[in-house]
Protein backbone atom coordinates (compact mmCIF):
# COMPACT_ATOMS: atom_id res chain seq x y z
CA UNK A 1 0.00 0.00 0.00
CA UNK A 2 1.05 3.59 -0.56
CA UNK A 3 2.16 5.21 2.70
CA UNK A 4 1.85 8.79 3.86
CA UNK A 5 4.82 11.08 3.36
CA UNK A 6 7.35 10.20 6.09
CA UNK A 7 8.37 13.87 6.47
CA UNK A 8 4.94 14.65 7.90
CA UNK A 9 5.52 12.43 10.93
CA UNK A 10 9.27 12.97 11.24
CA UNK A 11 9.55 16.68 10.66
CA UNK A 12 12.44 16.36 8.21
CA UNK A 13 13.02 15.20 4.63
CA UNK A 14 14.53 11.85 3.75
CA UNK A 15 16.04 11.54 0.28
CA UNK A 16 16.60 8.08 -1.15
CA UNK A 17 18.74 6.36 -3.74
CA UNK A 18 18.28 2.67 -4.58
CA UNK A 19 20.78 2.45 -7.41
CA UNK A 20 23.85 0.30 -7.95
CA UNK A 21 26.82 1.89 -6.18
CA UNK A 22 28.79 2.03 -9.44
CA UNK A 23 26.29 4.64 -10.63
CA UNK A 24 27.03 6.96 -7.70
CA UNK A 25 29.81 9.23 -8.95
CA UNK A 26 31.74 11.85 -6.99
CA UNK A 27 30.07 14.54 -9.09
CA UNK A 28 26.69 13.22 -8.00
CA UNK A 29 27.74 13.07 -4.35
CA UNK A 30 28.82 16.69 -4.61
CA UNK A 31 25.33 17.67 -5.74
CA UNK A 32 23.79 15.62 -2.94
CA UNK A 33 26.01 17.46 -0.48
CA UNK A 34 24.76 20.79 -1.86
CA UNK A 35 21.16 19.61 -1.48
CA UNK A 36 21.62 18.44 2.10
CA UNK A 37 23.35 21.66 3.09
CA UNK A 38 20.39 23.60 1.70
CA UNK A 39 17.77 21.39 3.41
CA UNK A 40 18.45 21.46 7.17
CA UNK A 41 18.07 18.19 9.11
CA UNK A 42 17.47 16.23 5.91
CA UNK A 43 18.71 12.66 5.68
CA UNK A 44 19.83 10.34 2.89
CA UNK A 45 18.88 6.66 2.64
CA UNK A 46 21.00 4.56 0.27
CA UNK A 47 20.00 0.99 -0.58
CA UNK A 48 22.19 -1.07 -2.90
CA UNK A 49 23.20 -4.72 -3.44
CA UNK A 50 26.85 -3.92 -2.71
CA UNK A 51 26.09 -2.78 0.85
CA UNK A 52 26.29 -6.38 2.07
CA UNK A 53 30.06 -5.90 1.77
CA UNK A 54 31.79 -4.12 4.66
CA UNK A 55 34.45 -2.99 2.20
CA UNK A 56 31.83 -1.32 -0.01
CA UNK A 57 30.21 0.38 2.97
CA UNK A 58 33.58 1.63 4.22
CA UNK A 59 34.51 2.96 0.78
CA UNK A 60 31.18 4.74 0.37
CA UNK A 61 31.38 6.24 3.86
CA UNK A 62 34.81 7.64 3.05
CA UNK A 63 33.60 9.18 -0.22
CA UNK A 64 30.52 10.68 1.43
CA UNK A 65 32.59 12.23 4.18
CA UNK A 66 35.23 13.55 1.79
CA UNK A 67 32.59 15.22 -0.37
CA UNK A 68 30.88 16.95 2.53
CA UNK A 69 28.01 14.69 3.58
CA UNK A 70 27.84 14.09 7.34
CA UNK A 71 27.69 10.36 8.00
CA UNK A 72 25.22 10.75 10.86
CA UNK A 73 22.70 11.93 8.27
CA UNK A 74 23.07 8.83 6.08
CA UNK A 75 21.34 5.45 6.42
CA UNK A 76 22.69 2.39 4.61
CA UNK A 77 19.97 -0.16 3.81
CA UNK A 78 20.75 -3.75 2.87
CA UNK A 79 19.22 -5.37 -0.22
CA UNK A 80 15.87 -6.99 0.52
CA UNK A 81 13.29 -9.37 -0.93
CA UNK A 82 10.87 -7.68 -3.32
CA UNK A 83 8.02 -7.14 -0.87
CA UNK A 84 10.33 -5.76 1.80
CA UNK A 85 12.13 -3.63 -0.78
CA UNK A 86 8.88 -2.02 -1.96
CA UNK A 87 7.78 -1.47 1.64
CA UNK A 88 11.10 0.26 2.28
CA UNK A 89 10.10 3.00 -0.14
CA UNK A 90 7.75 4.23 2.59
CA UNK A 91 10.89 5.43 4.40
CA UNK A 92 11.79 8.06 1.78
CA UNK A 93 10.06 11.24 0.66
CA UNK A 94 11.48 11.13 -2.86
CA UNK A 95 14.37 9.54 -4.73
CA UNK A 96 17.45 11.25 -6.12
CA UNK A 97 18.39 9.65 -9.43
CA UNK A 98 21.91 8.85 -10.59
CA UNK A 99 23.44 10.21 -13.79
CA UNK A 100 24.54 9.72 -16.52
CA UNK A 101 23.17 6.23 -15.83
CA UNK A 102 19.69 6.79 -14.35
CA UNK A 103 17.30 4.26 -12.91
CA UNK A 104 14.72 2.37 -14.92
CA UNK A 105 12.96 -0.39 -13.00
CA UNK A 106 13.71 1.30 -9.67
CA UNK A 107 12.07 4.50 -10.90
CA UNK A 108 8.96 2.67 -12.10
CA UNK A 109 8.62 0.66 -8.89
CA UNK A 110 8.94 3.82 -6.82
CA UNK A 111 6.25 5.55 -8.88
CA UNK A 112 3.93 2.63 -8.19
CA UNK A 113 4.55 3.11 -4.47
CA UNK A 114 3.77 6.84 -4.72
CA UNK A 115 7.39 7.96 -4.59
CA UNK A 116 8.63 10.32 -7.34
CA UNK A 117 12.22 10.44 -8.56
CA UNK A 118 14.17 13.60 -9.35
CA UNK A 119 16.28 12.87 -12.42
CA UNK A 120 18.89 14.73 -14.44
CA UNK A 121 18.48 14.30 -18.19
CA UNK A 122 21.48 13.80 -20.47
CA UNK A 123 22.22 13.62 -24.19
CA UNK A 124 22.51 9.87 -24.82
CA UNK A 125 19.62 7.42 -25.10
CA UNK A 126 20.44 5.84 -21.75
CA UNK A 127 21.04 9.18 -20.04
CA UNK A 128 17.51 10.23 -21.01
CA UNK A 129 15.83 7.11 -19.63
CA UNK A 130 14.70 8.79 -16.40
CA UNK A 131 13.47 11.79 -18.38
CA UNK A 132 11.42 9.51 -20.63
CA UNK A 133 9.85 7.58 -17.74
CA UNK A 134 8.91 10.63 -15.71
CA UNK A 135 7.61 12.60 -18.69
CA UNK A 136 5.31 9.76 -19.75
CA UNK A 137 4.17 9.47 -16.12
CA UNK A 138 3.17 13.15 -16.14
CA UNK A 139 6.08 14.30 -13.98
CA UNK A 140 8.10 16.42 -16.39
CA UNK A 141 8.68 18.95 -13.60
CA UNK A 142 10.81 16.28 -11.90
CA UNK A 143 13.33 16.38 -14.76
CA UNK A 144 16.38 18.64 -14.37
CA UNK A 145 18.55 19.74 -17.30
CA UNK A 146 21.80 20.37 -15.42
CA UNK A 147 23.35 19.98 -11.99
CA UNK A 148 22.32 23.43 -10.81
CA UNK A 149 18.67 22.77 -11.65
CA UNK A 150 18.90 19.29 -10.07
CA UNK A 151 19.90 20.88 -6.75
CA UNK A 152 17.38 23.71 -7.07
CA UNK A 153 14.48 21.34 -7.76
CA UNK A 154 15.41 19.07 -4.86
CA UNK A 155 15.44 22.04 -2.51
CA UNK A 156 12.19 23.43 -3.92
CA UNK A 157 10.32 20.13 -3.57
CA UNK A 158 11.68 19.68 -0.05
CA UNK A 159 10.10 22.95 1.04
CA UNK A 160 6.60 21.77 0.07
CA UNK A 161 5.80 18.61 2.08
CA UNK A 162 2.06 19.18 1.63
CA UNK A 163 2.57 19.16 -2.15
CA UNK A 164 4.63 15.98 -1.87
CA UNK A 165 1.89 14.35 0.20
CA UNK A 166 -0.78 15.25 -2.35
CA UNK A 167 1.36 13.81 -5.15
CA UNK A 168 2.05 10.66 -3.15
CA UNK A 169 -1.64 9.95 -2.64
CA UNK A 170 -2.54 10.28 -6.33
CA UNK A 171 0.63 9.03 -8.03
CA UNK A 172 -0.23 5.33 -8.30
CA UNK A 173 -3.49 6.04 -10.10
CA UNK A 174 -1.79 8.68 -12.25
CA UNK A 175 0.85 6.25 -13.50
CA UNK A 176 -1.68 3.43 -13.79
CA UNK A 177 -3.51 5.53 -16.38
CA UNK A 178 -0.34 6.50 -18.25
CA UNK A 179 1.21 4.56 -21.17
CA UNK A 180 4.00 3.60 -18.76
CA UNK A 181 1.75 1.08 -16.98
CA UNK A 182 -0.76 0.43 -19.78
CA UNK A 183 0.95 -2.22 -21.92
CA UNK A 184 -1.67 -2.21 -24.69
CA UNK A 185 -1.63 1.56 -25.01
CA UNK A 186 2.17 1.61 -24.95
CA UNK A 187 2.42 -1.09 -27.63
CA UNK A 188 -0.07 0.73 -29.86
CA UNK A 189 1.79 4.01 -29.56
CA UNK A 190 5.15 2.33 -30.14
CA UNK A 191 3.85 0.56 -33.26
CA UNK A 192 2.42 3.81 -34.62
CA UNK A 193 5.78 5.51 -34.10
CA UNK A 194 7.62 2.73 -35.94
CA UNK A 195 5.22 2.94 -38.89
CA UNK A 196 5.61 6.72 -38.99
CA UNK A 197 9.41 6.37 -39.05
CA UNK A 198 9.14 3.75 -41.80
CA UNK A 199 6.95 6.00 -43.95
CA UNK A 200 9.33 8.91 -43.38
CA UNK A 201 12.25 6.73 -44.47
CA UNK A 202 10.43 5.66 -47.64
CA UNK A 203 9.53 9.27 -48.44
CA UNK A 204 13.16 10.32 -48.07
CA UNK A 205 14.27 7.63 -50.53
CA UNK A 206 11.57 8.33 -53.10
CA UNK A 207 12.70 9.88 -56.43
CA UNK A 208 12.28 13.62 -56.50
Question: Model segments located where?
Answer:
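Short acidic alpha-helix that forms the nucleotide-activated donor recognition element
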Residues: 81-92, 112
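Catalytic binding pocket for nucleotide-activated donors in carbohydrate/polymer assembly enzymes
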Residues: 94, 98-183
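C-terminal amphipathic helix plus adjacent low-complexity
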Residues: 9-11, 19-21, 34-37, 41, ...
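Short acidic-capped amphipathic helix/loop micro-motif used as an active-site/signal-coupling element
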Residues: 29-33
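Residues that mark the start of a beta-strand
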Residues: 12-14, 43, 116
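Conserved H-loop
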Residues: 70-71, 140
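Active-site donor-binding acidic/aromatic loop of nucleotide-activated sugar
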Residues: 71-81, 99
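Nucleotide-sugar donor-binding and catalytic loop/hinge architecture
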Residues: 1-15, 23, 27, 37
